[in-house]
Structures are given as structure tokens and as C-alpha cells.
């Protein structure tokens, strides 16, 4: 999984008011020291917007044996479907595009007013009918859902998007990738990840995609995660650190860690 193009402007902290004004400056050695201290001070330093650079990296990737790349960039963070098509043709690397929404800071303003069903329908359209960036040359369809972003303190719309993503995954059979926040601390991290997995499991139960909600030793954090993982396996999903997919075949699960 990788980002070939990415515009994280909406995720960056507010521009500093004090000099030096390096946020919009060209990426040169003059600002190297400042960027070592804080890489996110400069927009060019965090943008991935060069098709030429992406092509060079894909050529090196293929030379090393790579044949398939999953691009987890969503539309609001700079997804570029037409450029992905050009790169796939130029490098002979198969590129699979994702769909959905990342964390709330990157959401388009209209998303807050959308229902879970309508958000799921948007994802389904991109998987089955093609992305809005499609053109006369052909439909540009997503091949998986994600990466779906969930903040350390999850926003209500993020949780709605997560439930919608599960709904679309169950409807279409598409793999689902969730990108969790970096949460430090054993108990805090356990509760955070447990909450994400619980939402996924609950939504699959609601949709009739899960046959049983029990299982697992809940005396420890690892046991609790193991229990939820087994539930998802019973539903036909294999959950790893960054995503959920349908295993082939579906084998018995084992705990994380």
C-alpha cells in the first residue's frame, strides 16, 4: 500500500504567523534545518504531486520484483485516477485505486450532511460504476475501500464513514482498509483499536454478514482483540494492522501479537 499522489494540506497545523515564512517557499537547502525540526512547515515537502517522480519510483519498484501497488489515497487528499492509469501503462505495474474518506479534517464540507446509506452508496458507485474523475477513455473504478481514516479522538462523521465503508464492503465484497491514528500507551491503544474493530463487527452483524458475536478470552487486551478478530473471521474477513480483507480460504484465526 502506498501513496503515489497526495495533498495533505488539510491535515497540516495552521501556518505559523512568525517568520520565517517558509510554508510556501521552494524546497531548497536554505530551509533544510527548519524542516528537520518540523517537516510539515513547508507544503512542497509534504506534497506528492510529481508524475515523473512517481514513474521513476514505480520503475524501480518493478525492477525489484514489484508487480502490484495499492494506492490508498482518497479523493479529498489528492487522488489522481487519470495519472494512475498513465503510470500503470507506462511502467507495467498494476495499480489498484481506493475510495472513501480519511479523517474529519480532510472531509469535504458537504459530507457532514450525508447519511450512512448515502456515503455507502458513493463508495459502491466508485467500485462498480467508476470514479467521478472517469473520462471518455473508460471508467476508472476503485478496487478497494480505503484508506478510511479514524482520528485518535474519533469524530462522529468518521464513525459514520467507517460504518458506511463496512456496509459497502459487505454489499460489494470489496476489501476494506482502515488507517488508525498513532495512539501511544498500551491501555489507550487497546481501547482505541478495540473500538474500531467493534464498530466493524457490529455493522457486519447488523447487515447479517456475521453469524456469531462471541468468542475469545476477554480478560486481557490481547484476548479482547483476539475475540473480535475471530468474530470477523467467522464473517469471512481477515483483519490485520491496516486492513480487513476476505481470506481465501477462510482459516482459523489466531490472536494479534
Task: Give the ranges of each region predicted by the language model.
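Distinct, well-ordered alpha-helical segments
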Residues: 82-84, 110, 155-160, 184-204, ...
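Active-site gating loops and adjacent loop-to-helix segments of metal-dependent hydrolytic enzymes
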Residues: 2-48, 99-120
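Active-site gating/metal-coordination segments in enzymes
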Residues: 86-90, 94-175, 228, 243-244
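Active-site-adjacent C-terminal substructures of enzyme catalytic domains
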Residues: 211-257
Amino acid at each position: 500500500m502506498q501513496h503515489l499522489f497526495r495533498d495533505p494540506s488539510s491535515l497540516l497545523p495552521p501556518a505559523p504567523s512568525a517568520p520565517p515564512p517558509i510554508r510556501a517557499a521552494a524546497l531548497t537547502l536554505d530551509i533544510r534545518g527548519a524542516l528537520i525540526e518540523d517537516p510539515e512547515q513547508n507544503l512542497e515537502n509534504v506534497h506528492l504531486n510529481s508524475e515523473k517522480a512517481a514513474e521513476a519510483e514505480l520503475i524501480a519498484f518493478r525492477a525489484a520484483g514489484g508487480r502490484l501497488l495499492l494506492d490508498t489515497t482518497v479523493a479529498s487528499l489528492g487522488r489522481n485516477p487519470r495519472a494512475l492509469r498513465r503510470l500503470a501503462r507506462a511502467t507495467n505495474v498494476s495499480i489498484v485505486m481506493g475510495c472513501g474518506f480519511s479523517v474529519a479534517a480532510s472531509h469535504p464540507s458537504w459530507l457532514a450532511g450525508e447519511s450512512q446509506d448515502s456515503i455507502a452508496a458513493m463508495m459502491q458507485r466508485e467500485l462498480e460504476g467508476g470514479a467521478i474523475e472517469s473520462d471518455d477513455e473508460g471508467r476508472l473504478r476503485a478496487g478497494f475501500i480505503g484508506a478510511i481514516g479514524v482520528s485518535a479522538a474519533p469524530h462522529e462523521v468518521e464513525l459514520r464513514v467507517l460504518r458506511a465503508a463496512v456496509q459497502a464492503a459487505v454489499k460489494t465484497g470489496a476489501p476494506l482498509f482502515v488507517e488508525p491514528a498513532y495512539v501511544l500507551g498500551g491501555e489507550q491503544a487497546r481501547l482505541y483499536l478495540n473500538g474500531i474493530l467493534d464498530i466493524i463487527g457490529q455493522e457486519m452483524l447488523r447487515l447479517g454478514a456475521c453469524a456469531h458475536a462471541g468468542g475469545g478470552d476477554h480478560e486481557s487486551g490481547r484476548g479482547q482483540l483476539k475475540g473480535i478478530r475471530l468474530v470477523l473471521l467467522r464473517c469471512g474477513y481477515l483483519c490485520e494492522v491496516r486492513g480487513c480483507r476476505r481470506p481465501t480460504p477462510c482459516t482459523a484465526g489466531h490472536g494479534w501479537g
